[in-house]
Amino acid sequence: YWPSMPDPENFDAIDGKPSEEFMADWLVRTCELIDNYHPKILYFDWWIQQEAAKPYLKKAAAYYYNRAAEWGEEVAIDYKFDAYMFGTAVPDIERGQMADIKPYFWQTDTAIALNSWCYTENNDFRPAGDIICDLVDIVSKNGALLLNVGPKADGTISDEDTAVLTAIGDWMQVNGEAIYDTHVWRTFGEGPTKVQDGGFSDGVKKNFTGEDFRFTAKGDTLFAIALKANDNGEYHVHSLRMQEHTAGTVYHGLVESVSVLGTDDAPAWTRDESGLHIKTCLLYTSPSPRDGATS
């Protein structure tokens, strides 16, 4: 044992303790939102980690989860700063990701614009390819992406936001099978490009290469998602190499077939001691990221 140390994320000393009247009003308003709108997600940004809020958080969670059970719905509460006891809600990382796979479900929340959560002048919009790569990386590590879109004052969505969302939707139309209802594999991926761990890092450019892959799985299918297309259509997945189990490789099974999502053409493939080698008919010359999934 050792002397206790102050939590660096404890804001009680600078924020002041809320009154019981305030917290009771907060709880009633939260329950009113739950009853009136049946939300799928209850998202709390910050401040609720206050010590005075803890008993009210328990009541809010109990009310929400019980009401969801009555509705027959699966719901989630998102939180930061250890506001909820681990395992009772979903931990959230603002504008950042995990560097490695996690045994528990987690979430990233970020916005299409790097410099604002709202629609403002001179928004720095992120390319759709960057957001798609983040989505794939997050899912491969047992996470989910909550993407914010800031509407204009009249409630409409800007052309720039619409273009990004449409591009993401087009990609999901082809590759959604590798995202929806999948689970993590033995490792999240491979490749030379590292992802920074923790929040407020989505502004750090990730220069993915054709050697960067992320893995997801569903049933007896493994999805290997390339985070950047190779112009020659060739891909080499080293995690699927043929080696004895004593060599430390992550996969010792058979590869029965290989296919590419979005096309009926069967790619040529071989497998040896260095990896699974795939030759596709899909060639891309554009420098922008074009993400494909192979299973």
Give the location of each predicted region.
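Mature catalytic domains of secreted/periplasmic carbohydrate-active enzymes
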Residues: 1-286, 295
